[in-house]
Amino acid sequence: MKVLFPPTYFPSPHLETDLELMADYLEQGHEVYAVQCRGELPTCFANWEHRPAVCLECRGRFDMGMEILGERVTILPMSPVEDTPEGIPAQFSDIDALKSFTWKGAPVGLSAASSLITKHKEHRLDTIAHQKEVQKEVLAAIHVFRTFKNAAETIDADHAVIFNGRFSTSLPAIFACEQLGITYSTHERGGTKDRYWHIQGTVPHDLENAAQEIDAKWKSTPESDAMRRGSQFFTDRRARVEHSWYSFTKQQQLERLPPCFDPAKHNISIFNTSLEEMEALRGRPAPVRMYRDEIDAVTRMVETTMDDPSIHSYLRIHPHLAGRDSTQTRRLRELHGRYCNLTVVDPDSPVDSYALMERSAAVVTFGSTMGAEACYWGKPSILLGHALYDHEDCAYRPVDHDETIGLIRQRGLPPRPRNGALRYGLWDLERGTPFRRFQANSLGDGTFEGKRVRPRQPLRLLIFFMKVLEHASMRLNLRWWNK
């Protein structure tokens, strides 16, 4: 079998995951190929501004990885970007127009939108104001699509392995596979830093795939181990243990509650989410069910329950939104002081999210892991969005606003069965496959086959001085690259 990789994201552990999978396929006797960018893309997820030093670092890491693998991977150089392809609009009227743009049957605009939304942390990105960036992102997506498709046809590839699957440098490769009838798989971080997640035929954001994996994991694990490991996921999160990503509650003060918190009231905690990862996903339902968005949901819930002075809601803004100035955060800030029965807890507030959850009558989420956590800790959880635990019955999933309000008003609302939360916790903690060759030292560093995958010393020194020069140029607004 001929397996094709487009390793366009070099930070650890993702490049090392590519290397791990390449080594596996080679060990199984397959032919492995890699389409390598050596600066041809005008922008990418790891190097938005196409800085020469970062580009050189990426190439140096890739070359070292190939050396560690014994030069057994056939490298297919990415062709230079040609003139701007026909069919690209001069500008896109808004982010929705960008999302719907297709080129030769491939919805490359969706991948460009996903990358740009993440870059600017703005789900309603002004595509007119950022016209130049939009054009570069679309051009990068088209170039990945065209180059990867040509490479796959040239070698007659049987399978492709792609990182993540939502960005402009990865999703177009999936489009190419689908047009050619080639199978593909994607990879992402696993449940801990010592694991990687390799998914056949779909992407990490696929809710149905998650449901199948959760069920298979639970059935294949002895009951006592499943219960213990499922519980560990939740106790570790509450203890701020960082398994696969950074803890957003680490800076909060344990047991701290909002000022004037009244335990005698029927308190409802609402935990929102960061929208940037969910706003441009192919095949994923709208982030919020029944309502236009989370702001609409919060305002309608608060306004409808205003007739009962014993009900008070607390909106905990996700800590990941701290310091941002975006459409989402501006609209959330506008809720401050608007309703007497709503307290808004800012993202950088030291209020303990777990203490707030613990002392609430019910918890409302839009996809946050807190929805499953609330169930585990014995609290009624109401899910108004979509989450990887959608099918686990660990949260109430109302079908309309009236049902939502009925759940909120109900005194003594029982939590959903804890078993669903345990199933999800087991899967999330043990999600993926243990690395055999990569040894993680932290969430973003490690060694592969006992060696650090980094450029050789002379090149590292050059990269260091180039970065110093680039940072100085950026401070003085005198950049000479990517114009």
For the regions a language model picked out, list residue spans one by one:
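Conserved N-terminal ligand/cofactor-binding loop architecture of enzyme catalytic domains
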Residues: 30-142, 189-249, 441-450, 467, ...
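Nucleotide-activated donor-binding/catalytic signature segment of Leloir-type glycosyltransferases, i.e.
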Residues: 330-347
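Conserved catalytic-core segment of nucleotide-activated headgroup transferases in glycan assembly
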Residues: 239-334
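A short, glycine/small-residue-rich beta-strand->loop->alpha-helix junction that serves as a flexible
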Residues: 8-17, 162, 276-282
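Conserved nucleotide-sugar donor-interacting segment of glycosyltransferase catalytic cores
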Residues: 144-199
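Histidine-anchored nucleotide/phosphate-binding helix
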Residues: 12-34, 174, 291-306
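Long, C-terminal catalytic modules of enzymes
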Residues: 308, 394, 398-483
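A donor-sugar binding/catalytic signature common to diverse glycosyltransferases
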Residues: 169, 348-396
